[in-house]
Regions:
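Short, charged low-complexity linear segments at domain edges
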Residues: 142-158
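Glycine/small-residue-rich loop that forms an oxyanion/phosphate-binding "nest" at active or ligand-binding sites
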Residues: 105, 111
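ATP-binding/phosphotransfer module of carbohydrate and carboxylate kinases, centering on a glycine-rich
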Residues: 1-63, 73-76, 94-102, 116-126, ...
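A charged helix-plus-loop insertion that forms the helical arch/lid used to bind
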Residues: 77-88
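Short glycine/serine/threonine-rich phosphate/pyrophosphate-binding segments
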Residues: 13, 112-115, 137-139
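Short beta-strand segments
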Residues: 7, 65-69, 107, 131-137, ...
């Protein structure tokens, strides 16, 4: 039996046919429309196209799994609110079921990515894992015993909104001091720009050709590798914030594995070694406690499709 995985993003909707081993047989991409009725119709058309091109009969499809950004109630099959898409109470399960006649399940996009990496990716072979996705904010997913744990009404698993600083920086969620204000890719860029303005002789200026608007998540890291003192300080401080965010979750769940994804994860072992060392030194239980394995996500842009399909694992 095959499964359909649908990864809804702010810019595009990726749909794929996935086999029982988590391999994508074929996939397609369409632009995300802000009209939810159009989105559903486009997904239905993409599924029909994939079935036709692969010679797959609809009777061979176990179900459609959907990953979507925002607040998702998996039990009700509803995207309650997606701020990036300005969607409210999007009944995706009911809508897709009506169009296709197939069973449909939905979960938050970060949750399905975590599920994909646990079942088929970086943490394959581990039952319990937590994934942190470092981007505009900090997405996260928790997998316990091979299944997504999303809390009551599917509203939990938000590591980006644990508090690092009481009365700290104002977060877009309305609270202050949230982790994503310090450990997201957006925060890293902000910290990098601040350090550059305070250190006019920093190699970080060379990396961006003197244009501070070209700063991205690589600027401080690549300059740090060349020994630039200001960049080293930015990276070490950022890794401290990220490590403390991870520790907050480790000390509650103590998973078998931690997965780091998103743009910043492209730094690979350079990032991972710093975070691993910090967490092993400062976690509850110190050297006597069992260590959670740490990995960089490996499925990339396919994690959303694979994880969504795995809702029918």
């Amino acid at each position: 039996m095959y499964r359909i995985g649908v990864d809804i993003g702010g810019m595009s909707v990726k749909t794929g046919i996935v086999d029982e081993n988590g391999a994508i047989i074929k996939k397609t991409v369409t632009k995300t429309d802000r009209n939810t009725d159009v989105v559903l119709e486009n997904i239905k058309n993409d599924i029909d196209k994939l079935l036709s091109e692969t010679g797959t009969d609809i009777s061979e499809i176990k179900g459609i799994g959907v990953g979507c950004p925002g607040s998702v109630d998996s039990e009700k099959g509803e995207v309650i609110y997606s701020n990036n898409l300005d969607w409210w109470h999007f009944l995706v399960v009911k809508g897709l079921n009506a169009l296709t006649g197939l069973k449909v399940r939905v979960s938050n996009d970060a949750n399905v990515a975590a599920l994909a990496e646990t079942l088929y990716g970086a943490a394959k072979g581990y039952k319990d894992a937590i994934m942190f996705t470092l981007g505009t904010g900090i997405g996260g997913g928790i997998v316990i015993d091979g299944k997504i744990y999303a809390g009551g009404h599917s509203q939990g698993a938000e590591p980006g909104h644990v508090t690092l600083f009481v009365n700290g920086e104002k977060c877009s969620c309305g609270r202050r001091g949230c982790a994503e204000m310090y450990a997201s890719a957006t925060a890293l860029i902000k910290q990098t720009k601040k350090a550059m303005l305070e250190n006019k002789d920093s190699k970080m200026w060379d990396f961006v050709g003197g244009d501070i608007e070209k700063v991205d998540g690589r600027t401080a890291f690549e300059s740090s590798k060349k020994g630039d003192p200001a960049a080293v300080k930015v990276v070490d401080t950022y890794c401290m914030y990220l490590s403390e965010t991870i520790l907050n979750m480790l000390n509650i769940f103590r998973p078998d594995a931690v997965i780091i994804g998103g743009g910043v994860s492209a730094q690979g072992d350079y990032l991972l070694d710093k975070v691993r060392a910090y967490c092993e030194k400062d976690h509850y239980g110190y050297i006597l406690a069992p260590k959670s394995k740490m990995f960089i996500a490996k499925l990339g842009n396919d994690a959303g499709i694979i994880g969504a399909a795995a809702l029918f694992e």
